Amino acid sequence: MSEQIHNPASEKEKGRVPQYLIISILTIFGIGSQYFSNLSYILNQTVIQNGLHISSNNLLMPSTLSNLAFAFGVPLGPVLTKKLGLKKNYLFFVLIFLFGSIISAVSPEIITLTAGRIIQGFSAGILFLTILPLSLISFPNKIRNTFLFMIITGLFGATALGALFGSVSLTIDSWRWLFYLNGFAAVLCLVIGFYALPKNKKQDNKKADKTGLFLYSLLMIVLAFPLCNLTQKGFTSIYIWPFLVAAALLLVLFIYVDLKAEKPLVPFRSLKAAKPFSGTVMAIASHLALVIAIAGINGFLRNNLDLPFVYITYFWLWFFAGIVVTAVLKTLLYDKLGAGVLGFIGSLAVIYVSAEWRVMGPETSLALLYFQVACLGAGISMVLVGGALGTALAGDIHQASMRSVTLHSIRNFAGAVISPFIGWFLMKQNAVNYEGIRESLSQDDSEFKLQIMKLVQHFIGEGLPLTTAKNMASYELVANAKRSAVLGAYHQLFTILLVISVIMLIASIGKMVTGKGRSLVQKQTRVLLPAPKEKDLKNSVS
């Protein structure tokens, strides 16, 4: 990027706020608002469902389409920034995000809520690579490592705060105020950005590949229908698999076209070297791990532990605490150890958590869960940010933006696609597990009768009559079977998380092997003047 950043020293002389702090605020509130909305929506779906009087199946549509819209907008950000200029592009799409937030906040039905979430997702996707690269280069060289603290606590922190505020919305049984918070953040960005963003000229020398843009747009449209209906209809439905096959063909064609294009929308060729490739795998795998972990642990807390909402709030506070720890460690150690070593450490933390969660039960202590979710937040953020930054700084620095566009486009696309698959997987495994439990009980009549007898005696001991005790025993047995079935589904999901965390570990090792890479804080080389000749010294003394 060639935007002019004001010299921090000159700003200090004028008594102004340093430019890097202003850009950081615009980055956190401009992009983080979408992450905040995503996580708060996941947690407070019950409140929204009751408020809009809709079925649980309809609740998946706003989040699925919002994620797709965000993924669609990510590679368009740099294209529109070059065409419109950074300031105009940023302010325009922040305004669009504000409109989306207002529509979501006042939505009387699921259709308008979905429209608002799509607008939010698309505009935030555009903003992502509009402001994020500027944020990095706005930091002065000597403190550029503090960019890591800003990006981790700001963007990952927005994710954690979204989960935290989503828990609060469950407690107070209200959800619209969360979108008003999004609107407030957008207004703040509009005011600050209008006065503080540097004015820059358009840089549109060559137009982006129109064929690639058309194929990418068509891919998102084709994917929208099956992803919104996958959980309800399943893979075998005629409404699902033909669309997924068509989407797969479009994806292959899009990659082929972009590889051949002179000005590709997503420059896949920029990742062909080993060093950026390993960093990309780190970032993508850790992003998928985050999506899977949040879906699994949120379901476990609600369905198997049945915690009061206040304890769920504490849970996500510990998640945020782990993120803050990583932010500090990354800031202090990134230039010394590199992305590979830190990613290795973070991967081990995620492996530990996933191994524990795949065998945990309702008897698990809250204190242990708090510690484990802190490890999860610390580990995933360490791997993801290290992989993303390590990819950008791997190789020719003039192609850093191209590598970032490719990495973040793939990462967000994969995250948008996997979420509906997680819902389908959990529903399918839950049904399979439940049927297996029912068959095992019906095949072994003696065990079934023994369990019923124990439960009947338990309820009679509590003072219930025999008929009521038998009914309660049957109900309790079915409820226990359902809880066991859904717990088994979460265990299987956490097994997938374990596999992905191992991939994160292998990619981190690959990053270590290929070298630490460029440091954030560059050492300043002093220019030494030649020593004066002895004769000149004598003359100057005399």
Regions found by a protein language model. Give the residues of each.
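12-transmembrane solute porter fold
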Residues: Y20-Y35, I42-L43, K263-A431
